[in-house]
Amino acid sequence: MTLLAIDGPAGAGKTTLAAKLEAEFSAHSTVRTIHMDDLYDGWDGALGSALTQTLEELTLAHLSAKECTVKFFNWHLMKFDREEVITPTDYLILEGVGAAQAVVRKAGATTYWLDIDAETGLKRVLARDGAHIEKEMRQWQIQQSIHFDLDQTRENCEFKLTS
């Protein structure tokens, strides 16, 4: 059971890297990618203790080859609206802001940090998701920076890449 976590600022290319790794690994193994966007409790509660608890449950279940039930957030309804049973796979890839936080590193994940400057990251996100979220994204950039500083995510990731 291999656990990978891809973290870094919004717009850095974490989802793209996760998709490439999943495609490569799935040729010979079972793989599941979990996107942090699906686990966040909206904009304001995204990087709090609920995410940490969910990640702890996910990583422990994965390493024990057990199932884990996870709540998924619906961004259109702005609430959690479904649960899914995550079954054991050979590889579990966690990707998104907060994916490589301390609880995941403690579980022995191979961790990747993708870096990007804030303005380029913002431009990429707005091109992908729409200009209507610019206000939320600017606040998100502050939240993610605080999270990264407190958690020392970048400093503790094994592999550092720049996009």
What are the functions of these language-model segments?
Residues G11:
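Walker A (P-loop) phosphate-binding loop of P-loop NTPases
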